[in-house]
């Protein structure tokens, strides 16, 4: 019987999305660091002058770690020992939260990185640390794409740093429009009434989903959240969104997806990529640094240099705040950020 069961059949029986499974399998097979991660039964105890922990958007993990490993070796020759654990964002943050829940700043990593709003914004968990002013980032010049008259990603309180963003855009199935106009903005998508029960949202992608909810609420309040609920049709993983074809009534008109995944869309596809004219909602990649470790500054500088900025940007797929890096954006590629007043 086992010989007659295909992988596709097994996934259907288990209720596992095929596209999402393929993506995770490919990441596992291509991740040279995964052999180490999977072999450990217990979390390894990190040692060093500077400890770095965090999560990165999945496509960024391998290239960042390759550059970081080389940096660590170079710093070891200079007498600086760095211990780190950086995982893919889809693996969750429970393993970092246990350090924070201890309320002991000595158990918290010197540098923490988080993709999205999931980790650093629980007032109950961080209140004591903020009260004691445990975190501080040195002010720096930002890339002009993120420091201009329309947007500023510099934290005025110098608690958080943002090193890159994951932009969220529309993927419109032109075969399903049925006479409707292609939505060109979040305001039109949410409030025109033309797209009720027509939009796919990646509920399982917490980084993106949290960014959607936080940003929409910060701009339009409860009415914005109600509007989001009205347009919602189904949850699709971004990898599945780019494969949707045809004019099936079960297919959404619009899929809200990270910009990175739109690079997988075929030119001959009926799927049209739309960068909202009121800005792509961003899920920031945040960095926090403990104030009392001077040696951590050297490591923070790694994430701010132009070579790493180019890796983060990935030719504009994950635009970076690092000064001098060309994010290869069009003039009309703006961003929508919840704002520091809202965060603080």
What name fits each language-model region?
Residues 33-123:
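Early extracytoplasmic/lumenal segment of secretory-pathway proteins
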Residues 200-204, 208-275:
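Ligand-binding pocket segment of bilobal, Venus flytrap-like solute-binding proteins
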Residues 44-47, 294, 301-344:
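Extracellular/periplasmic juxtamembrane helices and adjacent flexible linkers that interface
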Residues 179-194:
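Flexible hinge/capping segments at coil-to-helix
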Residues 53-59, 131-141, 155-162, 172-175, 196-215, 267-281, ...:
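Short beta-strand->loop
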